[in-house]
Amino acid sequence: MLAPDFPRPRRLGVSYVAVALVTGSGGLIGSEAVRHFAGLGLDVVGIDNDMRQEFFGPEASTAWNVRRLADELGTAYTHQGIDLRDRDALAKIFAHYGRNIAVVIHTAAQPSHDWAVRDPFTDFDVNAVGTLNVLQNVREHCIDAPVIHCSTNKVYGDRPNSLPYTELATRWELAPDHPYYDGITEDMSIDQCLHSVFGASKVAADVMVQEYGRYFDMKTVVFRGGTLTGPAHSATELHGYLGYVMRCNMERRTYKIFGYQGKMVRDSIHSHDVLTAFEAFFRNPRSAAVYNLGGGRFSNSSHLEAFAIAEKISGHQMITEYVEQNRVGDHKWWIGSNAAFQADYPDWKQVYDVPMILREIYEANVDKWVPAQ
């Protein structure tokens, strides 16, 4: 529903303060976007109906994060608890702020492979149709506003699994002379491979964002993220890899490893580094841009390696259970290349690597994630 007061943008002299509209504003990247763009002096309108709680259960609720944003930012933040599938409610928000909207950051999504199989209609409606609803409203009400879309490396389906990996002691790895050793680039095909139902809905959204950029000459970017992480993640088994590793370690929960001997590799990028990339695009937008965005060679780990880091930080051994079957479409190895983005935005730099990320997650949750009695 709309906020009761549904305020006009604040005035700054004779002008209105520019507005950043953030979908999924209670989530990891969404909440970081709210803080970041408020810090740049924009008013922020956040859209989030806490559907994550429906996807993953009460422990995944983002309501606590929304309350914290309101407390921290006061009048600079307005929350709208609507569903992106509700076209009428979404249109009212866009019409209300109109051309005062300076940027749209679309992070809202259904992010789980497993959940998508159970309810493919909701998955597609949220990921694909919800994205279309956002794009069309930008076109109608604030066409000059850049659209920053959080896509995923899952748009490449299981194609990365066809690469010639070697099994090492703690990880799968490519040979140093392989073209993708420094990271998979955007030239990898997203066609004719197994994506999972979730991956397919994200492909539809990804391509539609590109199409609105090209067809309507809108400023759009697709960021195909690796593992996006940080201390604000409401981590669960189905989503939130590093956060869930640390949570299981701290709460003495059993962590289930799905296939690949626990040696599957993920690159991990901190939400801070994601948002500095968003800001770079906001300041110098392009039409129909597509970039991989992840930890790259700077920040990556296998599950076994992440376990070892978590154990060193907390002083507690991981409790694990191995499941032979990997998840459908899951990557054996993913390290993405940030080279294309860094070529276009050479001032952007990464700050956080995996040990720093896990340490921060531990310190942020040490009073909350306590062992089960």
Language-model segment annotations:
Residues 23, 84, 125-128, 198-199, ...:
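Short, solvent-exposed loop/helix junctions and linker helices
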